[in-house]
């Protein structure tokens, strides 16, 4: 079984790299061991979120012996951290890899990469981030649902995100997103980092919903969109 896992993830890695290179992109980060693969890439395309604050398009992939996820990836140049847009329509989740012939599994990955490379995927993500940069957040109404999910990852994660958020002069949804993704950048555990980058992407895309409070404050209501379940 171990030999199969190594072969499958190696094939996926090579296919991913080929697809990215064919589109003038480059692989920026790779973690690969038998049965587990994390890889991120970027392309030359850029968008400006604020003055002198540019983001770069990309694709991120995670694969194990039983599943793979391929999503659009947005890399913020000024802080060198990225967000995984797991809720993008162009993203693909591929279950039951271990029941597919290698060629078929690799073909599905190639198709997923192609989907995530669509220019509309990056344009939509950049516009969502611009919108997030214009919306201040309420610590309790907006942030608490996300902080609860952060605490589920690790007891210290939520506290670290809050510290980073309040240390920066950006009290918007975009600022909150970047507090999460900057912590992801500095996290050594690959699974935790991926989940933080996914959560950062979700913060960017979640639309404010009216709170029933009398003062008319807005609250974000995140949906639980963790997708495929991976074993560590």
Where does each model-flagged region fall?
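Intrinsically disordered, low-complexity regions enriched in serine/threonine
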Residues: 29, 45-232
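A short acidic/basic microdomain associated with nuclease active sites
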Residues: 21-45
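Residues at beta-strand starts and edge strands
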Residues: 11, 35-37, 55
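Amphipathic alpha-helical segments
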Residues: 2-26
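A broad "ordered helical/assembly scaffold" signature
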Residues: 1-2, 35
């Amino acid at each position: 079984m171990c030999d199969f896992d190594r072969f499958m993830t190696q094939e996926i890695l090579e296919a991913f790299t080929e697809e990215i290179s064919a589109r003038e992109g480059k692989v920026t980060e790779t973690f690969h061991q038998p049965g587990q693969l994390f890889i991120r890439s970027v392309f030359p395309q850029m968008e400006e979120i604020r003055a002198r604050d540019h983001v770069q398009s990309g694709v991120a992939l995670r694969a194990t012996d039983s599943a793979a996820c391929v999503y659009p990836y947005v890399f913020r140049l000024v802080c060198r951290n990225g967000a995984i847009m797991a809720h993008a329509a162009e993203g693909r989740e591929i279950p039951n890899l271990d029941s597919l012939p290698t060629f078929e599994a690799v073909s599905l990955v190639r198709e997923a990469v192609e989907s995530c490379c669509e220019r509309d995927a990056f344009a939509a993500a950049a516009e969502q981030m611009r919108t997030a940069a214009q919306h201040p957040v309420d610590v309790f109404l907006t942030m608490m649902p996300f902080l609860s999910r952060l605490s589920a990852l690790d007891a210290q994660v939520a506290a670290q995100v809050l510290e980073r958020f309040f240390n920066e002069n950006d009290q918007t949804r975009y600022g909150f997103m970047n507090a999460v993704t900057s912590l992801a950048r500095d996290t050594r555990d690959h699974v935790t980092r991926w989940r933080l980058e996914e959560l950062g992407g979700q913060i960017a895309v979640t639309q404010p919903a009216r709170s029933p409070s009398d003062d008319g404050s807005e609250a974000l209501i995140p949906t639980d969109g963790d997708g495929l379940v991976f074993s560590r």
